[in-house]
């Protein structure tokens, strides 16, 4: 049994009729003048920061617990960065933001909705006050793409996120806003990366159906795709293959299966005292994975890989972020996201639980 890594693509999925427009749950509550689709989250971020400012240099506050790709995209757009602290519950440290605001003018604040969650009432009220005072809110829902709440998600001036982390598509990200954006041409999404990743996804599907095929072949192509992604920083639109999938897939099945798998893992790992889910799932929250904290993260990650459970570390943060916030540093050293997505059922979740139990000898 193999769990995680890149999403395989079934050839049959490519024959499904296009029968819907692209929409996410948070969009039910609000209307947006502009929704644009990009090849990657970093393209959506860089595009946003390049075109939302009216002066030469802007200053943004980023959370200390953040992906280096976010930091790099903001820097490429020419913005200055300061980091605000987070709490151990992965919430905004309001006091830290106030301290930074007191040191000089800030144009924007970058808000991340972590691991399927949404904002607490106090942080939401604080952010809305800043928004009223003219601070631009850029809200990243890459971890909470399908999460829904009438207030606490989707409130940013610019709402963006990666789509490809959730679905069997080679690329994809979005930007939604009511703000005016210039009509700037975007490069085609047909790139070496999208082609190679698409091929790797098809090859993985074939490998899973016929284990006589060499796994190394699709892994090599997948690695070539990743290398291509990180050598081409062109802002691109989404590829035609991914755009087509977004108009034909069943979003409700994705949401339902992820919630069922996550809740099943939470309920059946309570006896494992060495791991802790990052937070309890609340109504409307849809997890990107079973995200846990463990003091033995690196050893656990290695053990899971040896047993064909391929996990993500969100994130190994930069030295600047570590220096800015010891809480973020501690979380970065202990966090791990175990796959529980729509590809899997209770059978695969039981296997994950068994592997976790073997690691701790229970």
Model regions and ranges:
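Short loop/helix-cap segments at secondary-structure boundaries that form the rim of catalytic
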Residues: 26-30, 71-76, 147-156, 206-212, ...
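Short, polar loop motifs at secondary-structure junctions
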Residues: 23-25, 65-68, 141-151, 296-297
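Active-site phosphate-binding strand-loop segment of PLP-dependent enzymes
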Residues: 90-183
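Conserved PLP-anchoring active-site segment centered on the Schiff-base-forming lysine
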Residues: 49-104
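PLP-dependent aminotransferase class I/II
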Residues: 32-36, 41, 66, 110-111, ...
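Conserved PLP-binding active-site segment in aminotransferase class I/II-type PLP enzymes
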Residues: 1-56, 253-256, 357-362
